[in-house]
From Swiss-Prot:
GO terms for molecular function: insulin receptor binding; signaling receptor complex adaptor activity. This is Growth factor receptor-bound protein 10. Belongs to the GRB7/10/14 family. Interacts with ligand-activated tyrosine kinase receptors, including FGFR1, INSR, IGF1R, MET and PDGFRB in a phosphotyrosine-dependent manner through the SH2 domain. Poorly binds to the EGFR. Directly interacts with MAP3K14/NIK and is recruited to the EGFR-ERBB2 complex. Interacts with GIGYF1/PERQ1 and GIGYF2/TNRC15. When unphosphorylated, interacts with AKT1 and when phosphorylated with YWHAE/14-3-3 epsilon. Interacts with NEDD4. Interacts with LRP6, thus interfering with the binding of AXIN1 to LRP6. It comes from Sus scrofa.
């Protein structure tokens, strides 16, 4: 900040006045000179002594030059503190003018070039009795900087860069979102959840979709969206969908790593928990091994080879199942590649099975000849290979991504209302027929209690229908259409489409959806995932006392509508292999 005016402009500053009174060796009378008439000292006694006029003028000139030299070294420059000490050797005094009246004109700005050279020297002369005041305008102290702020004087990276990202939903709708350049996939998902008024259960994911290559993968929560977007082709796009299996291997690793596929390099055996720790520990070296169908680069043929996955890459054996270094050939590197699942491997690449996946180098955009295509024998094997690839590549980053939502929930829990968490371990069958309740431990008795609960739900629904309904529709008509308002009902979709949706949103136990039956127009189908397998259960209508009910078990447990049926099987397993936990959902952006 340039300071205008002559040296006397400092004298009007109160802080400078205190410094002058404390440190200036000159008497106020000595500060007067040509152009600065001295004020008469009213307190001093009038002296009648003769004064040497020539000596007085010389003293006044010397005092004025000393003051100008001190002004050039800017005693107020650093944090408003007066620098005590001699000026640096590099500081040049002002040139003497021909006339003393033009030596310090009032309109001349303060010369601060010499003062800038004092920035480092002044640090050691700064007084310790006064607090350090930070410079509010550091960009003005650089050499060649203008005295006023301008957009060009700001650092080039200070302004946050923004970029537009187009995100598609499952129903084909899209939304253009303006995001920051450093926004991660998790942050963008939370933004879309907020704007779409969805429930944030930390299972949303951003999917990188390549329709021309038949590939897709879920972005990791820590990945920057703009960096991934720069590698996409014009046909590629981002999808916003659920993925309940994103971190399921941390909760139940036994379903993801079969014992016959996992080998140990440092120890011969270990538990599943130790296996995860070895995957997360960069110093250990667990391996995944097994036979895979491998497509040759540039050809349409597939070969079944013995493959092993390590931290250094994916290798195949050129001699049976031998893992000797001279028999191993590198197929793909983990660092500069990403793993994708094949959407239609049989149709597009002639894959021998439906459980294909691909390791795609990050530099590849449109060419399929550089893709490393592989196929497993079943879904569990494919999930094991893909999960191990993610763990070996990202390590602790995945565990940190998994822990972040839980840590946020723990921080916010004291500020939120307590919500009861319903889980399998906290639910037991109870008998309240007597004066006190008791836990039913006999499985057969618990099954009969579940059937009685179903009859109780049916009676309560019938009683409500008899009392009347506020809906203009007839109660029986309302019970047959009210399920269409639920997210878990997907209408008239085929069996293949329902299986595809469940696979996309994660093969976890309890993932389900309801749809119209294609074989029976009056029936419905419950599609449920259990142990990474998809099963279908038909829901048939039945009549009792003129009322229409729905049942999964041939009329043993009846419900007046599908909402009651879903609510019941979320709490009771009944005839199903597991309880209903997660429902497939499609959100329109």
């Amino acid at each position: 900040m340039a300071l205008a005016g002559g040296p006397d402009s400092f004298l009007h500053h109160p802080y400078y006045q205190d410094q002058v009174e404390q440190t200036s060796p000159h008497h106020p009378r000595d500060l007067a000179g040509p152009g600065f008439p001295a004020q008469p000292d009213r307190l001093a006694p009038h002296q009648e002594d003769d004064v040497d006029l020539e000596a007085l003028v010389n003293d006044m000139d010397a005092s004025l030059e000393s003051l100008c030299s001190a002004s050039e070294t800017a005693p107020l420059l650093h944090n408003g503190q007066h620098a005590r000490g001699p000026p640096p050797p590099g500081a040049r005094p002002l040139r003497p003018q021909a006339s003393p009246r033009h030596r310090v004109p009032r309109s001349q700005p303060l010369h601060i070039l010499a003062a800038r050279r004092l920035q480092e020297e002044d640090q050691q002369f700064r007084t310790s009795s006064l607090p350090a005041i930070p410079n509010p305008f550091p960009e003005l102290c650089g050499p060649g900087s203008p005295p006023v702020l301008s957009p060009g004087s700001l650092p080039p990276g200070q302004a946050a860069a923004k970029q537009d990202v187009k995100v598609f939903s499952e129903d084909g709708t899209c939304k253009v979102v303006e995001i920051l350049a450093d926004m991660t996939a998790r942050d963008l998902c939370q933004l879309l959840v907020y704007r779409s008024h969805c429930v944030d259960d930390n299972s949303w994911t951003l999917v990188e979709h390549h329709p021309h290559l038949g590939l897709e993968r879920g972005l990791e929560d820590h990945e920057r969206v703009t960096q991934v977007q720069h590698t996409l082709a014009s046909e590629s796009k981002f999808l916003f969908r659920k993925n309940y299996a994103k971190y399921e291997f941390f909760k139940n690793p036994t379903n993801f790593f079969p014992e016959q596929m996992v080998t140990w390099c440092q120890q011969s055996n270990g538990s599943q928990t130790q296996l995860l720790q070895n995957f997360l520990n960069s110093s250990s070296c667990p391996e995944i091994q097994g036979f895979l169908h491998v497509k040759e680069l540039g050809r349409k043929s597939w070969k079944k080879l013995y493959v092993c996955l390590r931290r250094s890459g994916l290798y195949c054996s050129t001699k049976g199942a031998s893992k000797e270094p001279r028999h191993l050939q590198l197929l793909a590197d983990l660092e500069d590649s990403s793993i994708f699942s094949l959407i239609a491997g049989r149709k597009q690449y002639g894959a021998p099975t439906d459980y294909g996946f691909c390791i795609k180098p990050n530099r590849v955009r449109t060419e399929a000849k550089e893709l490393r295509l592989l196929c497993a024998e079943d879904e569990q094997s494919r999930t094991c290979w893909m999960t191990a690839f993610r763990l070996l590549k990202y390590g602790m980053l995945l565990y940190q991504n998994y822990r972040v939502p839980q840590q946020r929930k723990a921080v916010l829990s004291p500020f939120s209302a307590p919500v009861r968490s319903v889980s399998e371990n906290s639910l037991v069958a109870m008998d309240f027929s007597g004066q006190t309740g008791r836990v039913i431990e006999n499985p057969a008795e618990a099954q009969s209690a579940a059937l009685e609960e179903g009859h109780a739900w049916r009676k309560r629904s019938t009683r409500m229908n008899i009392l009347g309904s506020q809906s203009p529709l007839h109660p029986s008509t309302l019970s047959t259409v009210i399920h269409r308002t639920q997210h878990w009902f997907h209408g008239r979709i085929s069996r293949e489409e329902s299986h595809r949706i469940i696979k996309q949103q994660g093969l976890v136990d309890g993932l389900f959806l309801l749809r119209d039956s294609q074989s029976n127009p009056k029936a419905f189908v419950l599609t449920l995932c259990h142990h990474q397998k998809i099963k279908n259960f038909q829901i048939l209508p039945c009549e009792d006392d003129g009322q229409t009910f729905f049942s999964l078990d041939d009329g043993n447990t009846k419900f007046s509508d599908l909402i009651q049926l879903v609510d019941f099987y979320q709490l009771n397993k009944g005839v199903l292999p597991c309880k209903l936990k997660h429902h497939c959902i499609r959100v329109a952006l």
